[in-house]
Amino acid sequence: HEDHIGGVPYFLKQINIPIYAPRLAAGLIRNKLEEHKLLRSTTIIEIMQGQTIKLGKYFSVEIIRSTHSIPDSVMLAITTPVGTILHTGDFKVDFTPIDGKIMDLGRIAELGNQGILALMSDSTNAERKGFTMSESSVGDVFDKLFIHCTKRIVVATFASNVHRVQQIVNLAVKYGRKIAVCGRSMVNMIDTARELGYIDCPEDLFIDIDMIGTYNDEQLVIITTGSQGEPMSALTRMAAGDHRKVTITPNDLVIISANPIPGNEKFVSKVVDDLMQIGAEVVYSALADVHVSGHACQEEQKLIIALAKPKYFIPVHGEYRQLMAHAETAKQMGIDGKNIILMSNGRVLEINEEEAKLTTSVQSGKVLVDGLGVGDVGNIVLRDRQHLSQDGLIIIVLTMDSNTGEVVAGPDVISRGFVYVRESENLMDDVKSVVRHEIKKCEERDIRDWATIKSTVRENLKDYIFMKTKRNPMIIPIIMEV
């Protein structure tokens, strides 16, 4: 998925090391590195399920077949001088996966019988009881939507959910529909998956998005990005009537095959509302089971713990409350609470034959990418941007005599995102009066330091504006010398 490989090009610019990846992930990473002109300088080694890789004298990594929402998902059994560490990666226990490749539970059990020192397990759905539904169950729901539909069908899902796309492909073939693809990430993913053989379909099934006007509605399926209501995504632009290629009409059935990620609920609701106002029929997870999670719920997590029988348990991949819930599940499975270790990003865990203990911390956290800049946008810059977005900006421009300290011209007031100057002339006049008053006070106190004058103007003007408007714009005084 993008959240796993998106940072690879930026990481490689700092540390150029070999990449080990399953075939599909390797293909997607190659595409990404090619965009960044890093492909020739990077070594990518494709790995296979069941393979064991030797790393130096003391370590080896066994690749164990897993199941998730993307093909080629794996767990890693890392053999060290003090024992084996099993890392689940993202997983669910799906007994009817779309590609027929069931998780290798037998190998996990074998390793458990041999002795697993530590289990690091996916905690995303640790708060949810029961089992996660199989990916194939979504296909059954889709079939019921497709079978009698005479409308054009638009399906929004995560670009990397290849199993979901395969099910849409199967139904398009079954019901005689062509498929067009919208959204750059979706196009790239499907092209790569088809090229590598992860999507099985007739050669002529997919058509260019420019060709949709030559087919009747009942002959078309459009697969698109935008299931999270992202502002510039294809589905959002369709819902707003801004998409250049696709115009939504009342003769469309739109299926949003994803649950909103926490924080995206308002964006998704807005897209659904916009689509419904156009008159389109909209089906989403609150109305039908058109999405299932790719992560294990409590009973699947218990199964892995039971098979692995680890000495130490380390819940990973989740918010702290989810790590806590997973830790509680491990306690219920009989793991000693002293051997359950909750870690935060950057903490170092040292394990030897006798004990496991948290030691020091290393630098970790977000590295923000802003245009061509990587890591040069910090908390102060983000705070300023948030401030500007909420209350706007006022710039005070003064020209002062460098010898006498007298105001030669101004003050002039420039406002952006605070008030419309022409409609707030009285307030602008008051602002100028406050600035003149503060400058005069500085003159009387014989303050000639520009930094002090700016600070005085800024602080007093800030108090005045808040008193008058209950808003707190960013204030930037600019003093020019003559």
Language model segments and positions:
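His/Asp/Glu-rich metal-coordinating catalytic cores
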Residues: 1-215, 233-247, 266-270
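Short glycine-rich phosphate-binding loop at a beta-alpha junction
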Residues: 18-19, 314, 474-476
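Conserved hydrophobic residues forming the short capping helix/wall of the S-adenosyl-L-methionine
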Residues: 33, 330, 465
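Conserved beta-strand scaffold positions in the cores of enzyme catalytic domains, especially
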Residues: 44-46, 118-120, 254, 282, ...
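Broad gene-expression machinery/nucleic-acid interaction feature
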Residues: 58, 73-75, 219, 391-395, ...
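Hard-cation-handling environments
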Residues: 127-257, 261-430, 434-446, 454
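C-terminal tails and terminal domains of large nucleic-acid-associated
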Residues: 446-482
